[in-house]
Amino acid sequence: MTLLSIDDLVVEHRSPGRPAVRAVAGASLAVNPGEVVGLVGESGCGKSTLARAVCGLNPITAGSIAFDGEPVTPLGLRRRKLTGIQMVFQDPYASLNPRRRVGDQIADGLRTSNDTATSPADLLERVGLPRDFAGRHPHEFSGGQRQRIAIARALAARPRLLIGDEPISALDASAQSQVARLMRDLAVDSGAGLLFISHDLSVVRLIADRIAVMYLGKIVEVGDTAEVWADPRHPYTKALLQAIPKPDGMGVLPAELPGDVPDPANPPGGCRFNPRCPFVMDVCREKEPEFGPVACWLHEPK
């Protein structure tokens, strides 16, 4: 059974006196138990908004999100804990309470899951940290150590779905791959699903079973990671991979691709990538491709 099912999700940001911005514009995605799905795309494409909607932190405008067959939005904080969904945020410095010992913060999750057999020190050990760190405060640790503590805190609630929203981008290079592999191993070993959002294609390539590529609020390509890397089909996916300077196809997403990113408040008609696409056809400007796993008129199902 599918663990997480996102169907035609729409999330709008509204500000007084300004038009609504569709940060997520009809995205569909699934995550299965024990599966790691990597979500990639340029900054501002809607990845984090989608993740926060899954956690119930952003209200949805249309579409649906189901966790284990049950709707998960809108949710308050307490209800979110009860769903078995936990999120590891981008900034390990901001995600931990500086005034509380890390062991006490991990213990909050253990109480949520009614786990009386596991101690905070046990979870610190699972994420590769010494047991005596439980008695210390967040300011005493490096960024990589803090993110491991944040992972331990998330695991304490025994989640069935773990979401990493750019969880390695604030870390130094030496810690990034270690933390990403740790999240994968812990999620898979427990049978949980992992939705991993990152700009770092090298890490996504190493840990993800499947990859989803997002552009201007839309999922434009989904597939097995190895297959997408070997044969990217959507022109946007091809552009992302071709723009990486490393010859092995590994590396961080470039800051910019050729062409200007359209305004999300006023997206182009038809396919949203058509102003930047080298293969654009008349139909691309006239009609949006509403099919998958590759949302491109070049790959219209027969």
Model-based region annotation:
Residues 156-160:
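A short, proline-enriched helix->beta-strand linker immediately N-terminal to the Walker B motif
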Residues 170-252:
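P-loop NTP-binding/switch modules centered on Walker-like glycine-rich loops
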Residues 62-73:
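Conserved ABC transporter NBD signature motif
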Residues 137-141, 145:
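Conserved ABC ATPase signature
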